[in-house]
UniProtKB/Swiss-Prot annotation:
Protein's name according to its UniProt entry: Large ribosomal subunit protein uL11A
Subunit structure: Part of the ribosomal stalk of the 50S ribosomal subunit. Interacts with L10 and the large rRNA to form the base of the stalk. L10 forms an elongated spine to which L12 dimers bind in a sequential fashion forming a multimeric L10(L12)X complex.
SUPFAM superfamilies the record matches: Ribosomal L11/L12e N-terminal domain, Ribosomal protein L11, C-terminal domain
Assigned GO CC terms: cytosolic large ribosomal subunit
Superkingdom of the source species: Bacteria
Single GO biological process annotation from the record: translation
GO-annotated molecular function: large ribosomal subunit rRNA binding; structural constituent of ribosome
UniProt organism field: Halalkalibacterium halodurans (strain ATCC BAA-125 / DSM 18197 / FERM 7344 / JCM 9153 / C-125) (Bacillus halodurans)
RNA-binding found in the keyword field: yes
Family membership noted in the UniProt record: Belongs to the universal ribosomal protein uL11 family.
Described purpose of this protein according to its UniProt entry: Forms part of the ribosomal stalk which helps the ribosome interact with GTP-bound translation factors.
Length: 141
């Protein structure tokens, strides 16, 4: 028989930098999970993606064991890295902060493809372009 799930926790943690301090500690402590065990395993799995924020979905079972699935970094984080900026525009309709080439957008869309509910890469590209537009980033050919 399958183990009974008691809690699902979704977090966004910098790759390779999970530690028991907030937000990780309190979120997992409430569920009674071995926090250090999670941190070590997460850091080992994400050590190759340093500098990116990795969304993670942790499933906690009745016997306090857990499994977790790492997702691809958010499109906004990948766009900021591609454009070389610290943050998006406060007024994206007025102030444009950077430009990104369309082939870079395709690359980001292909990276995000497993986590997006898009039929093809073109649809995923449109989603990423929409994120860029709302951040004040101009897409050029």
């Amino acid at each position: 028989m399958a183990k009974k799930v008691i809690k699902m926790v979704k977090l966004q943690i910098p790759a390779g930098k999970a530690n028991p301090a907030p937000p990780v500690g309190p979120a997992l402590g409430q569920a009674g999970v071995n926090i250090m065990g999670f941190c070590k395993e997460f850091n080992a799995r994400t050590s190759d993606q340093a500098g990116l924020i990795i969304p993670v979905e942790i499933t906690v079972f009745e016997d306090r064991s857990f499994t977790f699935v790492t997702k691809t970094p958010p499109a906004a984080v990948l766009l900021k890295k591609a454009a070389g900026i610290e943050s998006g525009s406060g007024e994206p309709n007025r102030n444009k902060v950077a430009t990104v080439k369309r082939d870079k957008v395709r690359e980001i869309a292909e990276t995000k493809m497993p986590d997006l509910n898009a039929a093809d890469v073109e649809a995923a590209m449109r989603m990423v372009e929409g994120t860029a537009r709302s951040m004040g980033i101009v897409i050029e050919d």
